[in-house]
Amino acid sequence: MKPVSVLLIGLGRVGSRFYEKFRELGESRVRLVGVCEIDERHPLLQRAREGGVRVYENFEEALAPSENPVDIILDTTNIPEVKARIRHRLEETGNHHTVLLPLVASYLLWHMAAPGEDLPENHVQPGY
């Protein structure tokens, strides 16, 4: 089975946990094709670069049409405007392959990646 390619947006508490979990799973299962983080001094960015993960300053750059489209976008910013802009960018580029994970699916992943640990309070608003 081919690995699932994932673009991770945001490396806060939630995004960092997902980053670590995806790396633990290994490239044969999850291919982390990129991370987007506005804090250019975030400690995981250097590790990502060293591990061959592309680092983007913004998701628009990461979503440029490519021969190898991203399977899943995991937006952990919890900012509704970011999700709206991602959806718009996917439409604008005619990308019908990539799935922007709904927030509820992120909850499921969180419970699998961090069993017994509650989501941070600012990550509990419903919505797509």
Label every model-predicted segment.
Residues D75-T77:
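Short, well-ordered coil/turn residues at beta-beta hairpins
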Residues G34-I38, V55, I73:
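Short, hydrophobic beta-strand segments that form beta-sheet elements in well-ordered domains
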Residues K2-F22:
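Glycine-rich adenosine-cofactor-binding loop
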Residues E67-I72:
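Short acidic/histidine-rich motifs immediately flanking catalytic phosphotransfer sites
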Residues P80-Y128:
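Rossmann-fold NAD(P)-binding glycine/threonine-rich loop
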Residues R49-G52, T93:
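Short, structured coil segments at secondary-structure junctions
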